[in-house]
A protein has these predicted regions:
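Conserved, carboxylate-rich catalytic/transport cores that coordinate ions
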Residues: 163
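Peptidyl-prolyl cis-trans isomerase
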Residues: 95-99, 103, 154-156
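An aromatic/glycine/proline-enriched structural segment found at the starts
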Residues: 135-140, 173-238, 340, 395-430
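Short Gly/Pro-enriched turn/cap motifs at secondary-structure boundaries
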Residues: 1, 219-222, 282
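PPIase-associated folding chaperone regions across multiple families
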Residues: 242-251, 255, 268, 401
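M16 family metallopeptidases and their MPP-like homologs
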Residues: 5-40, 44-94, 107, 111-115, ...
Length: 430
């Protein structure tokens, strides 16, 4: 309970209904996303504009959004209007209208987004990089070009079936933060007791392809004045709060997470060939990638890759300096100190506690790790999780400008289409 402000935040996590659930019906990719957005549209008793007006009248907010493994329902209300807000939540959750016109509009929007992702170098880089990481069978490696084919096959009956199967309290969680006693809140939520449970199947995921050696991949984007670069690999680290994943993030802070990181200082401040270069670990319950990302002046593509590999090599082999370690400790501690100020941030904190079954003092444990992690441990993490000989290097840019620079780097070089398949004929290039 938080009494500083007269407001209440709620977050439902409907587990199993995230975009990974599309792996169960690969010919209907996009179904989870379309369903989630339709839940933000009309209900049986309110049109979409009428519902928006009703919520605005009382200063409330209800939104459905989707993540990897769950659909999230986020609710915000002034304390004095919580009863009416929950009535509207009940309407949205249990009485979606699923109007044909709204379904057609939302499906069309997703098709347009998928098409747009094939036109920008940065978007192409993201989708081809995922294909390299996860392969061509796993849903996480499926490009938007496939969505452009599957979205038109989704019907309104598919949406209704998905809603019936996946929008369930089975294994779901609810977190509440705000100016209300727990018992009073539970009484107001008793309408959830009648919610019928259904057991949805687990996502079907596939083993990632092995990376035998560092390889350079190229996808052509005609006329691109900037080159999009992605460099990295799929780690074996699931997300954690106080173990190896957290510590690997501290290790990476100096290399590519801070504004004054080695990568950003080199490519932006020293070479002046980019607006920014970043690197990060990005896992969930499932192990995720370590990625260096940047966009550079096309003429400096080869230079950028040499400098990135040089910085990674130096960090993995020589490690962090005393000054860098001290700065990391100070900067991360200050950043985290401001991470739980608002009720919305506290909502996220509680959701994290639940999702990862974490100790309530995990932030204290994190602070202890930040303050005590040694140079030796940082350097060991750099050696272990910056595998110089097993990286995917992806470049998206104009072939005429970029290809000669790539060929001079000495890595195995493979050209791909914008959906990540090897080019065997020049006609495959856009």
């Amino acid at each position: 309970r938080q009494t500083e402000l007269p407001e209440i935040w709620l977050s439902f996590a409907l587990k199993g209904s995230g975009y990974l659930s599309d792996s169960l019906t690969m010919d209907k990719l996009g179904l989870a996303s379309v369903t989630s957005q339709l839940m933000n549209a009309s209900t049986l008793n309110f049109s979409e504009p009428a519902m928006a007006a009703e919520l605005e009248k009382i200063g409330s907010f209800i939104s459905f959004s989707m993540a990897e493994d769950a659909t999230f329902v986020t609710v915000h209300s002034l304390s004095k209007h919580i009863d009416r807000t929950l009535e509207l939540l009940q309407e949205k959750l249990f009485s979606p209208a699923f109007k044909a016109s709204e379904f057609a509009r939302i499906r069309k929007q997703y098709i347009e987004v998928a098409e747009a992702q094939t036109r920008e170098a940065d978007s192409i880089a993201n989708m081809v990089y995922d294909r390299l990481l996860y392969g061509n069978k796993d849903i996480r490696g499926i490009p938007p070009t496939v969505l452009m084919q599957t979205l038109p096959q989704i019907t309104l009956d598919d949406v209704k079936g998905y809603y019936k199967t996946f929008y369930s309290p089975q294994d779901s969680t609810l977190v509440v933060v705000g100016d209300i006693e727990q018992e009073a809140m539970l009484e107001k939520l008793d309408f959830l007791l009648d919610w019928q449970q259904t057991a949805a199947a687990k996502p079907m995921l596939h083993a990632a392809p092995e990376v035998e050696q560092t390889t350079l991949y190229f996808a052509h984007k005609a006329g691109a004045t900037q080159t999009a670069i992605r460099l990295g690999y799929l780690t074996d680290l699931p997300y954690d709060l106080t173990s190896t994943y957290f510590k690997a993030g501290l290790m990476n802070f100096t290399l590519g997470r801070a504004f004054n990181s080695r990568l950003n200082l080199n490519l932006r401040e020293d070479k002046g060939i980019t607006y920014g270069a970043r690197s990060r670990f990005d896992s969930s319950d499932l192990p995720g990638p370590y990625t260096v990302s940047t966009a550079v002046t096309a003429a400096a593509t080869g230079t950028a890759i040499r400098e990135i590999m040089g910085e990674i090599t130096a960090y993995a082999e020589q490690g962090i300096t005393d000054a860098e370690l001290a700065f990391m400790r100070s900067a991360v501690a200050q950043r985290d100190a401001l991470a739980y100020e608002t009720n919305q941030q506290k909502l996220g904190f509680l959701a994290t506690l639940e999702k990862y079954q974490a100790d309530k003092d995990y932030t204290v444990q994190q602070q202890h790790i930040i303050n005590t992690i040694s140079k030796a441990e940082i350097n060991g993490l750099a050696r272990n999780y910056l595998p110089l000989d097993q990286l995917n290097i992806l470049v998206v840019g104009d072939r005429a400008t970029v290809w000669p620079q790539l060929a001079a780097l000495g890595y195995p070089l493979i050209e791909l289409t914008v959906d990540g398949t090897p080019v065997t004929d020049a006609k495959q290039r856009p």
